[in-house]
Amino acid sequence: MTPATAEVKVGGRKRKNDEPVFIKTKQSRSARREEEKENLLNKSLPSTPTSSEAGSSRESSNPVTSSSRRKNPPTKLENIQKTLPTCSDGLEIRNYVKKYGLPEDNKFLVRNVFDKQLLFGKKYVCRRRVIKSIDEFFPRLKTDAHRENGLYNFCTLQFMKISSWGSSMDEKIYVTSAAIVQSYVIIVDDNDSVTCIENGISVIPMANRTLPSISYNSSNVKNITLTGPELKKAKNVYLAVIVKRKTPKLGENRVGTRGKSTRASFETAASSENFQQLVRFGCTLMYDKDAEINCLNDGVQRIILLDREEKPAYLKIFGKADEPELENAWMNNVKHLEFISDTNYNKEDSHLARLIFSSNTHNYFDRPDISKFSPWQPRSRRTTLKSGISVEPGTSCDEDCGSQYEDTITLKQLLLGTKKLCGRRKRHLTRLTSRWPCFSVDPTKINSYFNETGVTLLENSCSYRPGTQRSIPIKPTRVIRVREETPVSVPIEVITIEDDSDDSPCFSARNRAPGGTRKYGLDFIQSSGHMPYIRYVYMNRANDLVPQLNGEENGKIEGLMEAYPMNNAHMYSDIEFLRKEKLNLPKNAQKYGEMTILDYPLTKTETDEYNKKMSVMNVKDFAVKPRKPIPTVGNTTLSLDLEGCPISTFSEIFFPSGKTELFNILCRHFYSEAGQRPGCFSAQWKSRVLTGFINKYHQYIFDMKLNSLFEKQINLIAMVSPDWKLEDFELPMVRYKQLKKEWKNRQRDIPSSN
């Protein structure tokens, strides 16, 4: 809309009317949007009187032209003399107050004027304030309230279901279809003094479906809180319950249950005169410091509900039904608690009444040794192991433990947190690291190999070791690091966990590269599974056994995707079989003899069993002529049956592989020590491994005349390597010839025995 003047014809001449007439003109979409935004802004701003130009703080933005005929241009906002500077700096405000002599009380008003000018000038970014719901900060308020009262969250109990106790239940009447559970947490200290904490009442439906809509003032979820002394001195923690329900009396008809149901009929039926109350008791051990039992975080569990009239011992403990004041007296006796708790260890409880509940902790009792934790002291940060084991840092060592760290510590002791480990030793056991080699080799005496006459199976002597067996504890050390971003003259001490690693691959860190750098993030995968399963990434380590290439200080970092023999059932079955059956080779088959096939001899029991199966064999197909009666053959050989036919057995072929087996022993020993093998890697790496092998075992190779086997191994690897080059062949071969020449020179210097 644009304003225009209306022309009126008066006395033959035209004159312009003073009142403007708005003529509708076309506007673009963007112009209309800008006009709407401007109108909204004008509506949101408070209207203030602008009688004079000097007193106005801003200019009106309404697009209405004045009816005045003066030709003076309109006054702009920036040309108006400002009463206050448009800056909210505290120093300028202070100078302004001193300059004009304003009182101190006006500082607040002056700052408001500054903020208002910045707000109207669109220099402030205003956001709508979102009020948080009470559910977001209610847990924090609850925790603060517990801290003010000296309480600590112990565990959370949720009573879920009652099984095998639903007799005489009518789902239409809530009195019989629900049970009331009164739970208690009983704490026993070192002096066998009992502290009983009541948890309130829970209502549990007897059927799977929910109860009718009745207003219960109880909840099935109970948050147990304890004070600091109770939490520190707890030796045993029991959970005791008293479950009550009602059943209709025998021999009496329930009033008002037939015909049309009314409110009066339900009230009459629910009266205590028509029902009898049943009471059951139960108790279970949740925590025991001495026996290292911790069931506070075991999830879903059950408590066997006992009837006082089931056994005379129960009647003596719980008292008679006409003595309700003695229902809680048994909780103060430690022997009664132990006796009732032992009934929960019965596994055949499918026919017994039981209460199903779940338990969850707040990480206070994740270690069995609760006595080490004092709630009155600030909780230190926990150290998480790479295997998923959490160990609390120790404080001090009360006894001398100089040589205790060198003792062998099993993973079971580390997981259970045994009390035999003192504080200093526990502080050392803060992390596990992998131990090389990943596979073990059975100890074999190479020198006495040719003197043996029995069969020695060496093919499967290299067995895989799981991660839990090749994990060793390492202790933390104090290191000094200097941060690069801050120039510090005195180095900042930061206590971290470092490896006591040397050049040996057995003590190298899993994320340490040959150059001493560490791999983090996706370059090195940490343990993410549950304990004690450990994930490993096999990387090329700093290894003296594998020489570096010429002109290189550090070798190339390569990821080794090796596959080790795991879960090899055939290998273990062979080992177990050879442990029981010992064979002796004939002289013509010993070590350097001809190829020989040996049959494992059968025992008399196996032969009799085989003949028995043949004698009772039934032929179901009558079209086939049945077997003839087995003739009696006076056979004295165990390898033949009654008919004189050989009985099938196991056999094994032996080749003249004396030198081959000895060479394999040397290779396996080297691969296990170096942690590498020249299998499926680059040609450069294969060449370096072969060079390291001849460097270490050249004395055995030349003494046992295994030269041809090493040369054959080089040629074989060269044939199966597509990227094999002349340089890769010359690296081990030149070293082999050099060592052979030195060995021959030493042999010449040795005087002959003749």
Curated annotation (Swiss-Prot):
Q: Which UniProt keywords apply?
A: Developmental protein, Nucleus, Repressor, Transcription, Transcription regulation
Q: Where in the cell is it found?
A: Nucleus
Summarize the impact of residue 283 to Y: In BN21; temperature-sensitive allele, which produces fertile progeny at permissive temperature (16 degrees Celsius) and sterile progeny at restrictive temperature (25 degrees Celsius), probably due to a mislocation into the cytoplasm
Annotated Basic and acidic residues bias: 31-40
Induction section of the entry: Repressed by GLD-1, which associates with the 3'-UTR of the mRNA and prevents its translation.
Q: Where is this region: Disordered?
A: 1-83
Report the GO terms under cellular component: nucleosome; nucleus; PcG protein complex
Point to the regions of Low complexity compositional bias. Answer: 51-61
Give the observed phenotype of the deletion mutant: RNAi-mediated knockdown results in ectopic expression of the homeobox protein egl-5 in the head region. This ectopic expression of egl-5 in the head region is enhanced in a nfya-1 bp4 mutant background.
Expression sites by tissue? In adults, it is predominantly expressed in the germline, and weakly expressed in intestinal cells.
One GO BP annotation here?
regulation of gene expression
Q: What does this protein do?
A: Component of a Polycomb group (PcG) complex. PcG proteins act by forming multiprotein complexes, which are required to maintain the transcriptionally repressive state of homeotic genes throughout development. In association with the nfya-1-NF-Y complex, may play a role in repressing the expression of the homeobox protein egl-5 in tissues such as the head. PcG proteins are not required to initiate repression, but to maintain it during later stages of development. The mes-2/mes-3/mes-6 complex may participate in the global inactivation of the X chromosomes in germline cells.
Q: How the protein assembles, per its UniProt entry?
A: Forms a heterotrimeric complex with the Polycomb proteins mes-2 and mes-3. Does not interact with mes-4. Interacts with nyfa-1.
| Name of the protein in its database record | Polycomb protein mes-3
The protein's organism comes out as: Caenorhabditis elegans
